[in-house]
């Protein structure tokens, strides 16, 4: 079967729409606690729990989760097993209603107009994890979402320039 069947694409599109709608609702209705000065994990926790509870009746049959822990198990030199390469997903949607199963991982990063903040998300510990599939092994897509700390005109053009540059392509 086609990895990106039309049903899978339709479900993925709906998942993204639900997440974006939840974001807009929180930004509008909970500006006191859902804003750029909060820690990233606080924002994704609130968003994840809000989606899981408030968006239960939107017609998606899968499960939302946030801050899922992932790791790799390897054999140590002494012969025992050990956990290595620990990581955490910000928000994840999973459904096995159809095959292949749909697992969408959303990673959120705070972005402003500065080079320093963009550079913090480049390389092996940044966007490369989505290119190499470290967070969404076997999935056709993973989603990195920028949380803009400044107005869109201040952040987005510089980010687009960076992503289209040689340095951005290497990241």
Please report, for each region that a protein language model flagged, where it lies by residue.
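Acidic-basic catalytic patches of nuclease active cores, encompassing PD-(D/E)XK
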Residues: 15-78
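Phosphate/oxyanion-binding active-site loops and adjacent basic polyanion-contact surfaces
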Residues: 8-15, 36-47, 83-85, 119-123
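Mg2+/Mn2+-dependent nuclease catalytic core
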Residues: 111-133
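Acidic, Ser/Thr-rich peripheral helices and adjacent loops at domain boundaries
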Residues: 159-171
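Nucleic-acid nuclease catalytic cores
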Residues: 136-160
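Conserved catalytic cores of phosphodiester-cleaving nucleases, focusing on short active-site segments
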Residues: 91-93, 104-112, 130
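Active-site metal-binding core of divalent-cation-utilizing nuclease and nuclease-like domains
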Residues: 63-101
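Short, small-residue-biased leader/transition segments that mark boundaries at the very start
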Residues: 1-5
């Amino acid at each position: 079967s086609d990895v990106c069947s039309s049903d899978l694409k339709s479900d993925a599109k709906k998942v993204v729409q639900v997440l974006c709608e939840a974001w807009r609702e929180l930004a509008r209705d909970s500006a006191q606690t859902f804003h750029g000065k909060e820690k990233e994990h606080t924002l994704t926790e609130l968003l994840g729990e809000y989606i899981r509870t408030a968006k239960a009746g939107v017609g998606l049959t899968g499960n939302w989760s946030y801050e899922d822990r992932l790791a790799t198990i390897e054999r140590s030199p002494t012969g025992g097993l050990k956990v290595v390469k620990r990581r955490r997903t910000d928000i994840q949607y999973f459904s096995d209603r159809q095959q292949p199963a749909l697992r969408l991982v959303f990673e959120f990063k705070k972005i402003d107009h500065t080079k320093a903040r963009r550079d913090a998300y480049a390389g092996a510990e940044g966007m490369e994890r989505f290119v190499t599939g470290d967070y969404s092994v076997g999935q056709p897509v993973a989603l990195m979402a920028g949380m803009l700390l400044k107005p869109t005109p201040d952040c987005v053009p510089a980010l687009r320039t960076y992503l289209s540059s040689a340095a951005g392509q290497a990241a």
